[in-house]
């Protein structure tokens, strides 16, 4: 099974550069605006899109992403509408991978089989489900693999050598290395330690390693890019969108332009870093 994620990372490896993986919250601040943001991301330089599934109790998310999820839910966003966003995007872009990220409760209530059928039909390529450990592979991971959808796992600085093989077992697409312990949007980790961790994980897998949590600026993204196959940026993009909203969470400025300006700067920095390192 070769997915869009596999194809994208193979292309980037041939180009000698890492991926820019961009996260935003589905339905934030409303469905129409979020869909415009999603469609604009690849043109701004995003290689992979992480599409957040808003949830009422997001335990791993920092204040910015929690607020984005709340805005989306208040605007009427549902899992069905998030899948609709993927389907609308896919009609115009058949190459950029879409990874849906969120919590298992949403999928469980929707129905696993129904969700996987609808996700595949909508052009979704991968899933990151932060609260579903490898011991529960039969719940979603294995059915997703059978449906042709990558199941992407998180590793952290506390994932030891005993735990790592269990985390990597049945993982596909790429490995998401969380560069620090804590919630999204916290301070960036020491890049040298990130490099050590990535090299260590690579001894146990051939999958690309993408690093996220705490990456906010083009300079930080460039520093991480020297060590990883991909850089994940989420909170900074969510904050760029939020900066164009009023106190009630309604659009007052141009969230699409704000998000794409940031992504363009991130993409330029990430790509230049690897090119400089190769010279």
UniProtKB/Swiss-Prot annotation:
Enzyme Commission number, as recorded: 4.2.1.20
NCBIfam families: trpA
GO CC annotations, alphabetized: cytosol
Subunit structure: Tetramer of two alpha and two beta chains.
Family: Belongs to the TrpA family.
MF term (GO), any: tryptophan synthase activity
The organism's place on the tree of life at top rank: Bacteria
Originating gene: trpA
Function: The alpha subunit is responsible for the aldol cleavage of indoleglycerol phosphate to indole and glyceraldehyde 3-phosphate.
EC primary class: lyase
Pathway: Amino-acid biosynthesis; L-tryptophan biosynthesis; L-tryptophan from chorismate: step 5/5
This protein's UniProt keywords: Amino-acid biosynthesis, Aromatic amino acid biosynthesis, Lyase, Tryptophan biosynthesis
Catalyzed reactions: (1S,2R)-1-C-(indol-3-yl)glycerol 3-phosphate + L-serine = D-glyceraldehyde 3-phosphate + L-tryptophan + H2O
Protein name: Tryptophan synthase alpha chain
Active site, renumbered: 50, 61
Signal peptide: none
